[in-house]
């Protein structure tokens, strides 16, 4: 029986085919594969291996089953299994890694122009057996030189596939999507393990309970791309965040001479007492909505979730605590509302327009002022009239124009702000981390550093100095 020995480039790795697909690597180098005619009937057998960046096919084709006159002018096309792994898509192109080649076809119109037959030799069946042994020895030699025997490769791939399936089953069993509390535990485990890797060198921070907390000096500044997900931070490039970690007994570097807490004597040094805070308490410390971790069922989804939804949720929570504070002060925020430290002026008003004017004057250290109020209070402000009975604002005036009329930069409405109450602060001077040793923080970009973002729990700090903020409340208002 006449057969043709065929050798060719089954797929040039890293190149785009006509379907917008790129194969970056394969998982079954050295495995046997069927050779088909245009992805239909079987016409021969062979195996695939790697030579440089090319997947090479070596095999035999039965002349009686494949009648094309010039196999050497024929292209090649691979069929593959992605093993359940989704393609990484960039600009409409799908990139696949560690795929399993299931078959290689001879075709006159290959989807990848670089995939083609490079060598053809005609011989008898008896010669085929001898050549098959020789070719096999050649490929085995190449594989052995690479550190892996060909006959062991199939077992290794099978073992890896089994491990992948076991891990998948284990993950699905331990984190069922219908139980958000399990997803939360998974998230906190990941967070705890990441935080445990962080260095144990820290400094005192301006928390309400700063003397009771030990923190690491791995700071990160949130980038403008993510800061602007929430308009209250437009232009506030001094928003810095930091994570909590466990402390080593005897470490005495949490205190920096000369640091102070808002509301205390600036010249009075603080006593550096320490207390470890377990990473698992980060959720309670932040008082974040439990929904932040719902739907997270594997590490890939966790990264994607952290990079999108979690960023927005945390910023919104920081805004809330920044202005209203927490009921018991456990989260370390100095809320502007009902501040008793003398650093945030508490103003009662009868005329909303005049009250905001007075509050802006209290923040006169610079012009970078933000005004925050509820939508209902804003609606009232739009209708405000002067002493002459005329409206103070044009009915088509935008928030920016109204803010500018007070000498402010931003005017934001938030549904969680109590009615008839207004927060005014200077966003260039407001720092979420009130350390005075800012030269030692490690800046990072959330778009590229998922691991660092994952390892950091976002927490807030305090207003730094007087003439930065004021809080308005309508006289006699219950603030509901």
UniProtKB/Swiss-Prot annotation:
Record has Oxidoreductase as a keyword: no
Main location: virion
Protein localization: Virion
Superkingdom of origin organism: Viruses
Disordered: annotated segments: 163-184
Keyword tags: Capsid protein, Coiled coil, Late protein, Virion
Coiled-coil intervals, chain numbering: 138-175
One Gene Ontology cellular component: viral capsid
Function text: Assembles to form a prolate capsid about 56 nm in length and 41 nm in width.
Protein name listed in UniProt: Major capsid protein
Source organism of the structure: Lactococcus phage c2
């Amino acid at each position: 029986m006449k057969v043709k020995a065929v050798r060719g480039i089954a797929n040039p790795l890293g190149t785009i085919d006509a379907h917008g697909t790129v194969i970056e690597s394969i998982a079954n180098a050295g495995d046997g594969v069927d050779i088909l005619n245009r992805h239909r009937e079987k016409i021969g057998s062979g195996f695939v291996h790697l030579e440089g960046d090319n997947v090479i096919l070596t095999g035999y084709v039965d002349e009686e089953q494949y009648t094309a006159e010039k196999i050497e002018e024929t292209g090649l096309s691979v069929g593959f299994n992605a093993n359940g792994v989704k393609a990484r898509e960039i600009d409409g192109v799908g990139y696949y890694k560690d795929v399993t080649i299931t078959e290689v076809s001879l075709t006159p119109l290959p989807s990848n122009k670089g995939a083609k037959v490079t060598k053809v030799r005609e011989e008898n069946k008896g010669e085929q057996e001898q050549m098959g042994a020789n070719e096999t020895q050649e490929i085995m030699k190449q594989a052995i030189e690479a550190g892996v025997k060909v006959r062991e490769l199939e077992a290794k791939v099978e073992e890896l596939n089994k491990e992948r399936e076991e891990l998948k089953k284990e993950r699905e069993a331990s984190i069922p999507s219908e139980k958000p509390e399990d997803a939360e535990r998974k998230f906190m485990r990941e967070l705890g393990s990441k935080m445990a890797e962080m260095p144990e060198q820290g400094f005192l921070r301006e928390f309400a309970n700063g003397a009771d907390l030990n923190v690491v000096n791995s700071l990160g500044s949130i980038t403008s791309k993510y800061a602007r997900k929430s308009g209250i931070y437009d232009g506030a490039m001094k928003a810095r965040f930091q994570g909590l970690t466990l402390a080593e007994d005897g470490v005495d570097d949490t205190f920096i001479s000369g640091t102070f807490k808002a509301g205390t004597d600036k010249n009075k040094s603080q006593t550096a007492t320490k207390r470890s805070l377990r990473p698992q308490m980060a959720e309670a410390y932040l008082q974040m909505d439990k929904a932040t971790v719902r739907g997270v069922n594997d590490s890939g989804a966790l990264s994607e979730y952290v990079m999108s939804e979690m960023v927005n949720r945390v910023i919104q929570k920081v805004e809330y605590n920044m202005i209203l504070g927490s009921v018991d002060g456990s989260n370390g925020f100095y809320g502007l509302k009902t501040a008793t430290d003398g650093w945030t002026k508490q103003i009662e008003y009868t005329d909303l327009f005049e009250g905001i004017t007075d509050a802006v004057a209290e923040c006169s250290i610079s012009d970078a002022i933000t005004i925050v109020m509820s939508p209902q209070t804003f609606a009232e402000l739009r209708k405000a009239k002067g002493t002459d009975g005329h409206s103070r604002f044009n009915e088509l005036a935008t928030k920016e124009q109204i803010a500018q009329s007070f000498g402010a930069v931003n005017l934001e409405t938030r549904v969680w702000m109590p009615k008839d109450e207004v927060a005014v602060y200077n966003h260039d001077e407001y720092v979420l981390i009130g350390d005075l040793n800012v030269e030692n923080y490690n800046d990072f970009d959330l778009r590229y550093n998922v691991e660092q973002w994952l390892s950091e729990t976002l927490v807030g700090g305090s207003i730094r100095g007087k003439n930065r903020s004021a809080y308005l409340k309508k006289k006699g208002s219950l603030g509901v």
